[in-house]
Amino acid sequence: MTAARGRASTTGSDSHQRILAVVRRIPRGRVATYGQVAVLAGLPRQARLVGYALHALHSDSAVPWHRVINAQGRVSPRAGQSAADTTQRIRLAAEGVRFDASGRTSLKRYGWRATARRSP
């Protein structure tokens, strides 16, 4: 399965909606990794699915997609979308998230400490 086919097949799905619900919970000034979001959405080992779900968002989406970064504490490059990478860094900086000279942020300092929500 190609990335494009995987992305198209998840649009609007239950998994996609669960991912977006988790991303909406990430507080201002904090970041979460793709893998962390996947686990919290009940989709362990599905970090790529998180990336596909975020990539499918419209540019005017209220979902704080910019708060999701890779496990190395970096903004993941997007093929053909260098402006999105810059936008992500600018939005995070505006929230107080700092990056070092190599483009890495401290997950220890800025990482979101969340737990899965319990069902009622």
Describe the function of each predicted region:
Residues T2-P120:
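Nucleic acid-binding interface residues in structured DNA/RNA-binding domains
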